[in-house]
């Protein structure tokens, strides 16, 4: 008896790791499509059937931890997942043996699912809620053991309660821990690659992308691309006059407009305080010039709304260079683009300067 319950516990723990690896951050919300909720329910239902197969028979009744998969389905999937898991577990139980005990167990497990569904409506389910659910479901199961199918073994009830509560609490702890760890990993990964303020690449990720593009240019005949540097005109004055929080708002809006103007495959980055850069792979010289002008006009034509409601007209200066039209060495593009950016600032700002130099 204790051995079979322990086997159930080890199966449960193994499933929890597989479950979190399969669904990852999708476990933190239940607003999935019905089909995806059904997939969660199928996984929990399969677990319930496996637990019954590895349970033990006591006076024509199967004793196992199938109540825990129902709780997992409700808390991390919703009503569709719960209904799917219940259907699988019910069918599995009736197929194993069809008797009075099986019918009682089906009724009890369906009733036990109701508190889990009620708790699942909470935005955040804590371990204490899981503990309360286990107390309720275990009480229902013990009631069925004792009064409906005459299982009066106090040793059986004690072992079941200990293993069930341990398994249920451990299950939710593992799922929560693994899910939070995955979300934290995603957050760290995002912070390693993206600028936290604007949502575009940071300097390090942009340099990695640029080096990869240099290598592609060296390996691919007739490959062409452009590099655009841009700088917000008089940004220091904006910070001094409106404050750094409004300066941040300008940076955010520029990042947003930049992403809306270029292709999804064009890497954009914030490489300095108010300096941005864009790579245009597989882009001709004429097309790159048009894109640069479109970026400039997108920023200058519409004022930026600050957090205090004021509208601020902002302009940018852009410098650009193209491979192979401006140079035969891809690695020299940053120097040429930076020179053109300096020229754009020196000749009046709010303009695009494209390199005409051929090295």
From Swiss-Prot:
Domain of life per record: Bacteria
One biological process term in Gene Ontology: cell wall organization
Keywords: Cell membrane, Membrane, Transmembrane, Transmembrane helix
Primary residence: membrane
TM regions (residue ranges): 4-24, 36-56, 68-88, 94-114, 129-149, 155-175
InterPro entries hit by this protein: Diguanylate_Cyclase, GGDEF_dom, Nucleotide_cyclase, Rev_trsase/Diguanyl_cyclase, Sig_transdc_His_kinase_LytS_TM
Disulfide topology: none
Subcellular location: Cell membrane
Span of domain GGDEF: 223-357
CC per GO annotation: plasma membrane
Topology class, membrane: Multi-pass membrane protein
Gene Ontology molecular function terms on file: diguanylate cyclase activity; phosphorelay sensor kinase activity
Name this protein carries in UniProt: Uncharacterized protein YhcK
